[in-house]
Amino acid sequence: METIFAQSSSFGKAGVAVFRVSGTKSLEVLKLLTGKSNFKPRFMYYQKLTSPESNDLIDNAMVVYFKAPNSFTGEDVVEIHTHGSKAISIMLTNALLNIPGVRLAEAGEFTKRAFLNNKFDLTAAEGIADLINAETIMQHKQAIRQAGGALEELYNSWRSQLLRIISLLEAYIDFPDEDIPESVLKDVTNTHKTLINTISEYLNDNRKGELLRSGLKLAIIGPPNAGKSSLLNFLMRRDIAIVSNIAGTTRDIIEGHLDIGGYPIILQDTAGIRGESNDVIEQEGIKRAIDSAKKADIKIVMFDAETLDSAVNEDITGLIDENTIVIINKIDLIPENRIFNIENKYRCLKVSIKNNIALPSILKNIEEIAENMAGFTETPYITNERHRHHLKQALVYLKDFNLDNDLVLATEDIRMTMHRIGAITGIIDVEEILGEIFKNFCIGK
């Protein structure tokens, strides 16, 4: 394979910039850049870097050589740590490009080579990508567990059980006249039933892992002028929505990203929902608000305490479910002991966004719902639609398995189940999906 390189750190001004080189010419590249002939693997050296063509000094750098297979990619690898300067990065990149047999790496190519050299499986590679993209503590916990091989271990345990079924049955395929012993039939049947139940239950996870990976959508809905935009600004801790006492100020969906209790929340402030409007633009805003609420994982339904009874309508209450927080805003403007009809049906939070009354309770309720929907558990969840697709197909083959059928055909159902699970981890030939997975990595990883 060609020797590749890339800047693994961000391009720009920084304390340190890190370049990575991987391939058979890595050590030769290091010698050309430094003029030094001997490098002990896994030792850092302070060296002058010069351009092999012009002999111009590039920088004083720290360099280290990792000898195959004891490196991230499994190949010879060199890391070069320079000062974080755009000029230095450009000069070093040009110097490397001018060395024959060395080229710039494609996105995710270092991780792809590590996978091809059996450093980890595909689920761990995806975990590394998720770890790089993690923005919250809970996303980090899920990603680092996957990168550490938790999903690989789970899926391989299922493959091992399937392999055991095949090994038990294949012993009798060549001897069709012999009856399969009762003990073998019982072992196969029990393992088969257990796997069906285990994988079925695993798939019935309400997409918790995928929600945590992508973020939970939270739609703020309610009648006009209830304080929805003020709530969005409070949650975002900055003004991203226009706040006005004029009904219908918000026409389109305004979105913001938030970390609540370690859970990634995608906030959506929507247009006020009211029964009648002659404004075509406002009508479209209301339609989008309702659509947004229907697709949301969490909903906040907000009412103005002064106009609540007249503002409640089926368009709004019809959207309330178990993952909805009902908020009565502007309680500072009404008598303290007032009870609303809506409180007889739903648990409501009484707050004042403007006067900072009971606002922590909103954050607490959001976190509780998020934890219930995407909370961290001992068993690693499915984090990727690719895994779910293959597991569903595996379950189809597993359910088709029947010992009353021809033994060869029955064994083939188990083999196809193994094939589908192997496609998740990369045990089988999966060249057609590698490009799709690794293109989402950054250059230099």
Swiss-Prot record:
Source taxon at top rank: Bacteria
Enzyme class, first EC level, given as a word: hydrolase
Binding site residues for GTP: 225-230, 244-250, 269-272
Residue stretches making up the TrmE-type G domain: 215-371
Record InterPro entries: G_TrmE, GTP-bd, GTP-bd_TrmE_N, GTPase_MnmE, MnmE_dom2, MnmE_helical, P-loop_NTPase, Small_GTP-bd
Predominant location: cytoplasm
Keywords in alphabetical order: Cytoplasm, GTP-binding, Hydrolase, Magnesium, Metal-binding, Nucleotide-binding, Potassium, tRNA processing
Residues holding (6S)-5-formyl-5,6,7,8-tetrahydrofolate: 20, 79, 119, 445
Pfam families per record: MMR_HSR1, MnmE_helical, TrmE_N
This enzyme's EC code(s): 3.6.-.-
Family, as annotated: Belongs to the TRAFAC class TrmE-Era-EngA-EngB-Septin-like GTPase superfamily. TrmE GTPase family.
Subunit structure: Homodimer. Heterotetramer of two MnmE and two MnmG subunits.
Function (record text): Exhibits a very high intrinsic GTPase hydrolysis rate. Involved in the addition of a carboxymethylaminomethyl (cmnm) group at the wobble position (U34) of certain tRNAs, forming tRNA-cmnm(5)s(2)U34.
The name this protein goes by in its record: tRNA modification GTPase MnmE
Organism (species): Rickettsia bellii (strain OSU 85-389)
